[in-house]
Amino acid sequence: MKSFDEMTPKEIVQELDKYIVGQYEAKKAVAIAVRNRIRRQKLPEEWRKEVLPKNILMIGPTGVGKTEIARRLAQLSGSPFLKVEATRFTEVGYVGKNVDSMIRDLVEISVNMVKQEKIKEVERQAEELVEERILDALVPESKAVPVVTNPFINLITGGQQQQYTPEDRRRFRAKREEMREKLRKGELENEEIEIELEETVSPFMGIFGPGMEDLGIEITNMFSGMLPKQKKKRKMKVSEARKVLLPLEAEKLIDMDKVVQEALDRAQNRGIIFIDEIDKIAGKESAVGPDVSRQGVQRDLLPIVEGTTIMTKYGPVRTDYILFIAAGAFHVSRPSDLIPELQGRFPIRVELSPLTEEDFVRILKEPENAIIKQYQALLSTEGVELVFTEDGIREMARIAYQLNQRLENIGARRLYTVAEKVLEEISFEAPDIPEKRIVVDAEYVRRRLERIVQDEDLSAYIL
């Protein structure tokens, strides 16, 4: 498979098609946006500064694939990705999260992403160090023979000097190698050992009220280097110790300065922020009530989307080249209800169409992570072969579509509730079923859902 930087917009859309049904226009828009980033990197320096990403506004009801398109695109491109709800933010001066926090969160995600990549590179080396630490716990050094020395030296050194006889050393090495052999064969995984771990005690967390969590985290990070690291001994099995020690030893091998530098560059030039429910902060200004800070949030959001510098604990971050994808249903408000300056910062607008019954059939069958494929994989672990007939799939799609028309339209998410109810009994009985091949056809689906679908009150609560 090609690297992402070599993929054409058409190929990016084809990759997204593996996971998301339909919505061609939205896929096309995001594919062009990320391809333009790659094109920008190839420009001369003076042009590179001038080319800014074209932010995207997705308009469409819930459950049609807005978030999934952005998330899959980020996974495909290896970009740091953050999803936020516009309604979570408040205008500066009000209690709550301010919009700057989304950039700090994006940088945190980017640092963790790069850190995990670097840890992967040194994993083999870290495994060797973990093995040595486990062996230290399994075969502790025996007490050496005390040597009589000058009492004055004993007073300074805090005790008598120790030394090992050659025979002690030989026995110790032989025992250690014997245990190493057993450890590598997996014979000691259930042995209990005592290991020493470092932990930083934070006296600041828990004293900040709602809406001030960011301040608490910032203060904790500021003082984390000054706080003493306490050493604590813990007893655990060798298998558990391996999991605990591996990231600790790997972290010692990576250069955190380089990690931060790469992470900042990645967040600034490849970061994607998905702002959901932006329609909820659109609308006319209200002087009182819960809507008092709607336009304030939009105005706070404006400089970040336009391009500004935000201070984070890792250093300053420029937001000019971060790709912002905003989304909303816009049932009550319209995109034109956003403040004009913010509208201008989302020049690409794509409308996602509501899902049809035929789309539901395709969603159940076609994506690589299709719902029925997930259930088949889960139940195969119990030795159960789950077979869905074409009419069974169509019946599930029909019922989900009808429920969306009768109750609230939640898009493809309705399929999860329908599938869960259809397969509830099978999932519960799976380990004890004598018949290991189960066929889910239209008759089976109707039998499982008939009573619930007919009773509107039950449908509202259960499906």
UniProtKB/Swiss-Prot annotation:
Top-level taxon in the UniProt lineage: Bacteria
Glycosyltransferase listed as a keyword: no
GO cellular component: HslUV protease complex
Protein name: ATP-dependent protease ATPase subunit HslU
UniProt cross-references to SMART domains, sorted A to Z: AAA, ClpB_D2-small
UniProt GO BP: protein unfolding; proteolysis involved in protein catabolic process
Function statement: ATPase subunit of a proteasome-like degradation complex; this subunit has chaperone activity. The binding of ATP and its subsequent hydrolysis by HslU are essential for unfolding of protein substrates subsequently hydrolyzed by HslV. HslU recognizes the N-terminal part of its protein substrates and unfolds these before they are guided to HslV for hydrolysis.
Compartments, as annotated in UniProt: Cytoplasm
Binding positions (ATP): V21, G63, V64, G65, K66, T67, E68, D276, E341, R413
UniProt cross-references to HAMAP family, sorted A to Z: HslU (MF_00249)
Family label: Belongs to the ClpX chaperone family. HslU subfamily.
Molecular function as annotated in GO: ATP binding; ATP hydrolysis activity; peptidase activity; proteasome-activating activity
Oxidoreductase found in the keyword field: no
Annotated gene: hslU
Keywords: ATP-binding, Chaperone, Cytoplasm, Nucleotide-binding, Stress response
Broad class of where this protein is predominantly found: cytoplasm
Subunit annotation: A double ring-shaped homohexamer of HslV is capped on each side by a ring-shaped HslU homohexamer. The assembly of the HslU/HslV complex is dependent on binding of ATP.
